[in-house]
Amino acid sequence: MKTSRRGRALLAVALNLLALLFATTAFLTTYWCQGTQRVPKPGCGQGGGANCPNSGANATANSTAAPVAASPAGAPYSWEAGDERFQLRRFHTGIWYSCEEELGGPGEKCRSFIDLAPASEKGVLWLSVVSEVLYILLLVVGFSLMCLELVHSSSVIDGLKLNAFAAVFTVLSGLLGMVAHMMYTQVFQVTVSLGPEDWRPHSWDYGWSFCLAWGSFTCCMAASVTTLNSYTKTVIEFRHKRKVFEQGYREEPTFIDPEAIKYFRERIEKGDVSEEEDFRLACRHERYPTRHQPHMGDSWPRSSAHEAAELNRQCWVLGHWV
């Protein structure tokens, strides 16, 4: 039982550690959701020479033509129409930040996702953040208790207590993690519809941080189930061994005929004490007709000072041998 219990404890510790690593990584990264955003192309006034009517080969042809009317107040303009006026840029978002790639450059521009969320959803987002933090803290507590259980593996009672507390903390952390992930998903979907115009995604999907978060939840629940299973199996094995141990020392049931008790009591009250030993031997003989028949000068079978005392207890009723 000790080896199997230690093996189950090691499995629970490994699953809990994996859940903790996944949860911490997902909490600190910005790839919960990723996709593309549709943004306008730069106009002529913003350095977009390719979009200007006088760029390239058209510049010579248009040099003798009438000048093109400029847009009012020098605002940028573009001759493209429809979807050609837009281009797609990639973005990725986490709990803390949302980052978009820079157009025409290798870098990224990041801004706080909490600021991007609608005012009606900021409370839910903060609740999600708090739940994620509690989720990680409870995972740490459960992991510590499981490690203590491994240290106290020689003591069954102490191990069971630590096992029970570790299972409770792990289950609670899993529930908090599930609620936190679902709340963040809800906030992101609302932000997609009601967020700032310059941020709203054209298309999006869940990223690897989101997969890590739910993988952490899966490992956490697997660790809790393993811990509960270890606790249950240890209790059942312990009770079974105790039951077998008690049955090994339990006295066999004694069935005494009330009429025989009355008969022996009347004989003794008449003063026929000389037959008391015969009554005792008869009791032994009747009780164990094959295994324990007394023989003069012989010892009892099954080796037996202890068993002889047991027979005496079984035949002694109301102060007399019966």
From Swiss-Prot:
GO terms for biological process: regulation of postsynaptic neurotransmitter receptor internalization; regulation of short-term neuronal synaptic plasticity; synapse organization; transmission of nerve impulse. It is found in: Cell membrane; Synapse. One of its GO terms (cellular component) is Schaffer collateral - CA1 synapse. The chain crosses the membrane at residues 9-29, 123-143, 164-184, 208-228. Keywords: Cell membrane, Membrane, Phosphoprotein, Synapse, Transmembrane, Transmembrane helix. It comes from the Eukaryota. It is a multi-pass membrane protein. PANTHER family: EPITHELIAL MEMBRANE PROTEIN-RELATED (PTHR10671), GERM CELL-SPECIFIC GENE 1-LIKE PROTEIN (PTHR10671:SF35). Component of the inner core of AMPAR complexes. AMPAR complexes consist of an inner core made of 4 pore-forming GluA/GRIA proteins (GRIA1, GRIA2, GRIA3 and GRIA4) and 4 major auxiliary subunits arranged in a twofold symmetry. One of the two pairs of distinct binding sites is occupied either by CNIH2, CNIH3 or CACNG2, CACNG3. The other harbors CACNG2, CACNG3, CACNG4, CACNG8 or GSG1L. This inner core of AMPAR complexes is complemented by outer core constituents binding directly to the GluA/GRIA proteins at sites distinct from the interaction sites of the inner core constituents. As a component of the inner core of AMPAR complexes, modifies AMPA receptor (AMPAR) gating. Belongs to the GSG1 family. This is Germ cell-specific gene 1-like protein. It comes from Mus musculus. The lineage of its organism: Eukaryota, Metazoa, Chordata, Craniata, Vertebrata. The gene is Gsg1l.
